[in-house]
Amino acid sequence: MPELPEVETVRLGLEPVLTGRRLTRVEARRPDLRFPLPVDFVQRLTGARILSLSRRGKYLLAALDRDATLLIHLGMTGRFEIEGAAAPGGFALAAPADPKHAHVLFETDEAARIIYYDARRFGFMDIFDDGDDRLAGLGPEPLGPEFNAAFLAEAFADRRQSPKTLLLDQRIVAGLGNI
C-alpha cells in the first residue's frame, strides 16, 4: 500500500499538471472502486478548477473552486498516469497501462489526461464540502511539529500494544505504514 512518502511523490507529480487547471471532462468507467463513487461524482467535478493539491496522511486532497475537496486514497495498487503533458518525475508515459484497470479519467483545459488505474480496486475517491471534518480523526503528520517525543510519550502511555502497532494506527500518527 502506498504510504506517506509514495503519496507525497504522487502529489508532487500531479501538482504541476492539475493545480490551477479546470477539469473539462471527467469519466467514471465504473460506479465504484473500494466504495461506491458519489452519485454526482462526474457532475460535481466537470468544470471545476483545482485550486491546490495537498496531502494529509495517505490521502490526496484536491481543493476545488466549488467549496469542496476531492479526496483520493490509492489503496494498494492505485496509481495515476498522465498523457498529453510533460510532468516531472516521469509520470507522463508513452505506453498506457492495461485499459481494463483505467477506472477514472480526468481531462484538463491544458489538454492533459490524468488516468487513475487500480488493478485491485482498493483505492477510493470521494468529494466533500469545505468544513467537513472527516479527516479530523487522523493523528499528526510524522514530519510536523506536533510529532515529537512528548507527543509519543503521551500517545503510548497506558497502552498495551507494541510500538509498531501504535505507530501504524492512523489516529496516532497519519501516513505511517509497514513498508
Functional labels for PLM-detected ranges:
Residues 22-41, 54, 80, 153-179:
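Basic, nucleic-acid-binding surfaces and adjacent catalytic neighborhoods in DNA/RNA-processing proteins
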